[in-house]
Curated annotation (Swiss-Prot):
Keywords: Cytoplasm, Initiation factor, Protein biosynthesis. Coiled coil: none annotated. It is found in: Cytoplasm. Residues 675-851 form the PCI domain. InterPro entries: EIF3C, EIF3C_N_dom, PCI_dom, WH_DNA-bd_sf. Component of the eukaryotic translation initiation factor 3 (eIF-3) complex, which is involved in protein synthesis of a specialized repertoire of mRNAs and, together with other initiation factors, stimulates binding of mRNA and methionyl-tRNAi to the 40S ribosome. The eIF-3 complex specifically targets and initiates translation of a subset of mRNAs involved in cell proliferation. Residues 1-36, 158-309, 880-926 are annotated as: Disordered. Residues 165-189, 217-243, 289-302 have a biased composition (Acidic residues). It holds the Pfam family PCI. The gene is eif3c. Component of the eukaryotic translation initiation factor 3 (eIF-3) complex, which is composed of 13 subunits: eif3a, eif3b, eif3c, eif3d, eif3e, eif3f, eif3g, eif3h, eif3i, eif3j, eif3k, eif3l and eif3m. It comes from Xenopus laevis. GO terms for molecular function: RNA binding; translation initiation factor activity; translation initiation factor binding. This is Eukaryotic translation initiation factor 3 subunit C.
Length: 926
């Protein structure tokens, strides 16, 4: 390449052709003594030695900057991550902090972050809008920061009392550090931590609009470009000096350059002049913007208003009718049909359609077109609200739900106010009478269908709301309005509805009543004589008991309903309500007389879920009444399956795609019961395991040596085996561990230890306090544990005693003598205990006919040896094969046939005798 191109002063040409430059060879030099050639990059860059303090503080300031950015955008997850990194970085800088003290910018961040988190925590509306991850991160960060700030409490308090002093101290420190550092380092390196934080704090608030900010940024960019062009002469001078010194001696590169005081002052003066010019331009621009803003305010007459992009400030109402059009019922009906034509079509704005219908209803009301038109429009508004979500799984938003409730209330108000109006699905649109008041008004529609859809939407809202949030509680308050709507519809249909419609609305009322415990009725039952009769009468007149209401509604359905499904649901709800209020015998008799257990497998899944819930409630009721065996039998099917959560409609279990695809999973999710109707699964399992313990432990003691002993509860045995497999047993913690520990104590006849494991503070909080009459249930449990422990003790140690007094047994188990007498008498009658009662001495005399433990072991050994011999003979016969002849045609494995053949052979004395055959085989082996 020509050397002409290498002579230019342009920096770009120098960098591109630096590789082509020809350097003079040294005279007499060898290959090993070539001169050291430094690249331009190495020549330009300067080595900067930074102290450990600067490194650590820069790391802290970078993390603080990231945290403040995350605070601006409310990214709590990022805040939490960076705060944890900041704590680790502060620990790394501990040696420097011990020498220099805690930096003020660190204290400032802790204080600001604490105030920021407290402000967010108190903002309940803002917390609701947060997503799940941000809300969780906010809670975690708040706890960690409060714990972390305890070490810096004094410094934070001092900073909050006088933050200005802290800023002044920081400034003094920064000035000292600037004076101590070299001017070259100050010009090349970035800001320190305190400078950065000070700059961030002193920045003016964002009071101007985005457009003004953009203009300011453009002006700054232009000014910076002007400065760059202005400094071009300096750069060209430096380039020329570089070219002149290019071929100088290489040793001069490593010599220290002497900088005079005059050169340093000239550089500083030039910097100050540039800064003053820049500040002057900024002040001038601010003054111009202030004048423009005042002119705009004077013209507009007010402040700026923040608007959403693309949304007009004034929303014009759509014109329903042309100007001057006379509003009559036919015209309104025609316009209604025009609006409904777009319903269901692709691209239709459903929200706009609802607004049009509401606007049309307002126009009809303004022009007094009659209640018939209003009812017809409101029916269509309700239908449009229900059609707003095309997806079945999507639930109504809160604003739509409120519109729905208000519209139904308005509709019922109109129907109650106009007794001459008839509505029904059987009315054809051509035969409707919407405005002729001389005849009864007739409108096509079904109020019951709207109410059933409203109830379905309410269920979907509850299913899709987090049950542990305040939003769920707020939504649950709407159930009172839903029940009020159903009750009003019930009154209306009782007057004008058919029998089928009355049964349907009665079932809706039942479904909102059956699972609720009537505390007022319960208190009236437990009321003492301290209350006067007038007070009791007043309490009874306030509201109808739920038991009376359920009885009246269900009996009407039993008598009038023609569909099996409504009657089945009513029976199950009635049984559930009886069981919930401890009416065990009524609930049991109704279940047995209905024969639902015979054909419930043919019902649809929601009815099966209701049946499972009813059986569980029936079992819990039997347990509260002390009927342990009935409780165990009622809960056996649900608990033994291991799918109680799924069978009760309270959640889905993890399954593979082969067992359940996504579509089936969506369908099953729609069948789930809302959270406020759930049955406590831990209470259910505890009731089942305690019932199994009270039945299984005495049975195991009575049949300890029985090889063919059956299991009453497989799940209970599984829990016992799990407890036995543990190498080291500590104190019980979970509910299951408490029941297993109580079972082991009952095996030994130690009823007090068993009671302490079943009834304690932990179990009371988890299970027993959830019952309405908790004290009565605990008393029943203690009595049952005493009785079953007595039976277990007699089964286990009867072989030890010749006789024992009933008084001693009563003292051991703290039972009355008649109770002990009753228990022992039942055991003797059922032939469970081989003994007799001596009435005069109140003594139980053991017969001693039962084998001892040694004898039982010997019997078991003999039985196992007999089985072993029989198996060996069968295997031996199988290995020898079958011989021809009459005697070998049968099954040789059948012992009865073999015995018959052996007897025949012994009688006949033939060659097939077993002894002869064995002798022949023995000789052949030799």
């Amino acid at each position: 390449m020509s050397r002409f191109f290498a002579t230019g002063s342009d920096s770009e040409s120098e960098s591109s052709l630096s590789g082509d430059e020809i350097l003079p060879k040294p005279v007499g030099g060898t290959f090993g003594k070539q001169p050291i050639i430094l690249s331009d990059d190495e020549e330009d860059t300067k080595r900067v030695v930074r102290s450990a303090k600067d490194k650590r503080f820069e790391e802290l300031t970078n993390l603080i900057k990231t945290i403040r950015n995350a605070m601006k955008i409310r990214d709590m997850t990022k805040c939490l991550e960076e705060f944890e990194l900041l704590v680790k970085a502060f620990i790394k800088a501990k040696n420097i902090v011990d020498k220099e003290g805690v930096p003020r910018f660190y204290i400032r961040l802790l204080s600001d972050l604490d105030d920021y988190l407290n402000e967010l925590w108190e903002d309940k509306e803002g917390k609701k809008k947060m997503n799940k991850n941000n809300a969780k991160a906010l809670s975690t960060l708040r706890q960690k920061l409060r714990k972390y700030n305890r070490d810096f409490e004094a410094s934070i308090t001092a900073y909050k009392q006088n933050p200005e002093e802290s800023a002044d101290e920081d400034q003094e420190k920064d000035e000292d550090s600037e004076a101590s550092s070299s001017s070259d380092d100050d010009s090349d390196e970035g800001m320190s931590a305190s400078k950065f934080l000070k700059k961030a704090e002193s920045a003016p608030p964002e009071s101007r609009s985005k457009f003004l900010k953009k203009e300011e940024a453009e002006d700054e960019a232009e000014s910076s470009e002007d400065e760059d062009w202005g400094s071009d002469s300096d750069e060209s001078d430096s380039d020329e000096s570089d070219d002149e010194n290019k071929h100088a001696s290489m040793a001069s590169r490593f010599l220290k350059k002497t900088v005079t005081e005059g050169d340093r002052q000239a550089v500083e003066k030039k910097k100050e002049d540039k800064a003053k010019k820049k500040q002057h331009r900024k002040v001038k621009r601010k003054d111009e913007e202030g004048e423009e803003g005042e002119e705009d305010d004077n013209e507009g007459g007010g402040e700026w208003e923040k608007v959403k992009g693309g949304v007009p400030l004034v929303k014009e109402k759509p014109k329903m009718f042309a100007k001057g059009t006379e509003i009559t019922p036919p015209i309104v009906v025609k316009k209604l049909n025009e609006i409904l034509l777009a319903r269901g079509k692709k691209g239709t704005d459903r929200a706009a359609q609802i607004e049009l219908l509401q606007l049309l209803a307002g126009i009809a009301e303004e022009n007094n077109l009659g209640q018939g038109i209003a009812v017809k429009i409101k029916f269509n508004i309700m239908a449009s609200l229900y059609d707003y979500n095309t997806n079945l799984a999507t639930y109504m938003k809160s604003d739509m739900w409120k519109k729905c409730l208000d519209c139904i209330h308005d509709l019922l108000d109109i129907l109650f106010a106009n007794s001459n109006m008839f509505i029904g699905e059987h009315i054809v649109e051509d035969s409707e009478n919407l405005s002729n008041l001389e005849q009864p008004l007739r409108v096509r529609g079904c109020i019951l269908t709207l109410i059933e859809r409203m109830e379905e939407e309410f269920t979907k809202i509850m299913q899709n709301t987090d049950p542990h949030s305040q939003e769920y509680v707020d939504n649950l308050k709407d159930e009172a309005r839903v029940c009020e709507v159903i009750e009003r519809a019930q009154k209306y249909l009782q007057e004008k509805g058919s029998t089928e419609e009355i049964c349907r609305v009665y079932l809706r009322r039942i479904m909102h009543t059956y699972y609720k415990f009537d505390y007022k009725a319960h208190q009236r039952q437990l009321s003492t004589e301290q209350e006067s009769k007038s007070e009791q009468d007043q309490a009874e007149n306030e509201a109808e008991d739920s038991a009376i209401l359920m009885d009246r509604l269900c009996k009407y359905i039993y008598a009038k309903d023609r569909t099996d499904r409504i009657r089945t649901c009513a029976i199950l709800c009635h049984i559930y309500h009886h069981a919930l209020h401890n009416r065990w015998f009524q609930a049991r008799d109704l279940m047995l007389m209905s024969h639902l257990q015979d054909n419930i497998q043919h019902a649809d899944p929601p009815v099966q879920i209701l049946y499972n819930r009813t059986m569980v409630q029936l079992g819990i009721c039997a347990f509260r009444q002390g009927m342990i065996r009935d409780a165990h039998n009622a809960l056996l099917d649900i608990q033994s399956s291991g799918r109680a959560k799924e069978l009760l409609g309270q959640g889905l279990l993890m399954r593979t795609m082969q067992e359940r695809n996504q579509e089936q999973e969506k369908i099953e999710k729609r069948r789930q019961i809302p959270f406020h109707m759930h049955i406590n699964l831990e209470l259910l399992e505890c009731v089942y395991l305690v019932s199994a313990m009270l039945l299984e432990i005495p049975y195991m003691a009575a049949h300890e040596f029985d090889a063919r002993r059956r299991m009453i509860s497989k799940q209970f045995h599984h829990q016992l085996r799990v407890g036995e497999r543990q190498p080291l047993l500590g104190p019980p913690e979970s509910m299951r561990e408490h029941v297993v520990a109580a079972s082991k104590a009952m095996k030994m006849g130690d009823w007090k230890t068993c009671k302490n494991f079943i009834i304690n503070e932990k179990m009371n909080g988890k299970v027993w306090d959830l019952f309405p009459e908790a004290e009565r249930v605990r008393g029943m449990l203690v009595r049952k544990i005493q009785e079953e422990s007595l039976r277990t003790y007699l089964f286990t140690y009867s072989s030890v005693y010749d006789s024992i007094r009933m008084g001693i047994l009563g003292d051991m188990f703290q039972l009355e003598i008649p109770t002990v007498h009753s228990i022992i008498s039942k055991m003797i009658i059922n032939e469970e205990l081989m003994a007799s009662l001596d009435q005069p001495t109140q003594t139980v005399v053991m017969h001693g006919t039962e084998p001892s433990s040694l004898q039982n072991t010997a019997l078991q050994l003999a039985e196992k040896l007999g089985n072993l011999v029989e198996n060996n003979e069968r295997i031996f016969d199988h290995k020898q094969g079958s011989y021809g002849g009459y005697f070998n045609r049968g099954d040789r494995g059948d012992r009865g046939d073999r015995d018959q053949k052996d007897q025949y052979q012994r009688k006949e004395g033939g060659y097939m005798r077993r002894g002869y055959r064995r002798d022949q085989q023995g000789q052949s082996n030799y």
